[in-house]
Amino acid sequence: MSVVKSFAWRWLAVRGSLRSSLMKSLIFPLLLLSLSEMQAQFPTIPMVLQPGKVLGKAEYVVDYSYWSKMAPQSKDSVEDIIRIELGQTLVKSYSYKLWQADSALTHAPDKSARMRVPDEGMSPFWYYRDLTNGRTQVWYRTPLSGPILSYIDTPTFSWTITGSKKTISGYETQLATCVFRGRSYEAWFTPSIPISAGPSLFGGLPGLILELRSVDGTHHFTLDALQKRAGDIVEWKVRLVKTVSRPQFRNYYERVHKHPIQTLRSNGQRIYPQDDQGNFISEAEAVDWQIPYNPIELE
């Protein structure tokens, strides 16, 4: 029997070398109570962010509510806020909730103190996308304060613009559809803001995307706030960065979900899983554990 069927997983104790100066001992709640409630992931841990070089100028700040399902068959969704800083030639996209947690840690007087684990569902990705050529620098935080993976991507979109229209927050929008990396999408974009961008790495339309959903219902971005606000788009300075290719990243991302214990140990992280009674489980049971896998990019 699979270990996820025989245990109500409540805690992962993580001790030892986490390649982080934040803490020497961490215990994170993993609220994965049963097979039918397999919605939890390893939490994305806050980190200290330092401002780096200025990459460009933003004209807008846009917030999207982002609902996603950790497992395709799940009835429940987790929610995040994805913020983009939008300029004519550059867009930066990241989890606003995670940025708030990062900011709290960055300005904390004692950065080694025990910290609150953020809510689940916060995206561990952030993006810098050059709108002149589509070149996108992708950053991914590996679980539990592991190294950060960075790779270059140049996504392309083959949108079909339809005649359907609707109004979103006072903006007239038009419907476009496409298949992108294994998923079918519907996007509502506004020509009133003629910048080819959207949440995360999406774009490729003659206007800003205000709403985006996968047809299978597992990923959905809706406009939460749109402000015309000038400012610098700043590159964050982070530590423990490992540059990889996109295929290398995809291989890691799949392994950390399908074989999390082995993958994290290969990073130098020592993981001690427990059942809901607080008992450490056997090695054989630990290596059988999996995390729900429903990436926004299937290919």
Stretch-by-stretch model annotation:
Residues 1-50:
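Bacterial Sec-dependent N-terminal signal peptides
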Residues 42-299:
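Extended soluble regions of mature proteins
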